[in-house]
Amino acid sequence: MKVHLFVTCLIDTMQPNVGKATVEVLERLGVEVEFPESQVCCGQPAFNSGYTKETIKAAKNMIKAFETAEYVVTPSGSCKAMFLEYPQLLKEDPVWSTQAEALAEKTYELTEFIVDILHVTDVGASLKGNATYHTSCHMTRLLRIKEAPFTLLSNVKDLSMTPLPRAENCCGFGGTFSVKMTPISEQMVDEKVQSIEETGAQYIIGADCGCLLNIGGRLNRLDKPIQVMHIAEVLNSR
């Protein structure tokens, strides 16, 4: 099986280790991974800021970048969710709208792909310690991907999982929200950090780099000894 990797801007520019872990996990499962170099930003920052024309341009670029893919896999629920906006954005053009629907249908978040398409629940990972999991808004509310991450994490050897109190509360990142509504965002991430501390976890795990950067930044400022890990990194741990 061959997939095209949608690496996302945050991973490409700030957390390339997550992209590397994603590739290594997939290859270990027998998947051939290709990286289309023509891929660009999915357009979510422009979309959230109301720049429709710029978003449409980004959407068309992404549709062309992945038009030959059978499967597109991304280690980001947020960016996959953006692909679901493309058909509506391009509804005035039947040709582009149809292509947008095709892209949305063949794109999978990493854990969703592993569990639902590869039918794998144990990737052979091992990580000693206690962890809790942050369920990002896009993963739970828009994509309805709730079970796959927990299924995979439950099979990581030597890893103990503790439920996160108020788990579905937003961390306060929200893309441009954290820039436009900084005081509110700060209060939200403080509440998230408090919830994480209540678990006594050594690791906070998530599937969206935006959330993890926000939470990790706050933990660092507060000098909290809790390690932030993307789920791809956990699944790649040995």
Swiss-Prot record:
GO cellular component terms listed in the entry, alphabetical order: cytosol
A GO term, aspect molecular function: oxidoreductase activity
Biological process terms in GO annotation: lactate metabolic process
Cited InterPro entries: Cys_rich_dom (IPR004017), LutA (IPR022822)
Domain of life: Bacteria
Pfam families: CCG
Family per record: Belongs to the LutA/YkgE family.
HAMAP family the UniProt entry points to: LutA
Main function: Is involved in L-lactate degradation and allows cells to grow with lactate as the sole carbon source.
Protein name: Lactate utilization protein A
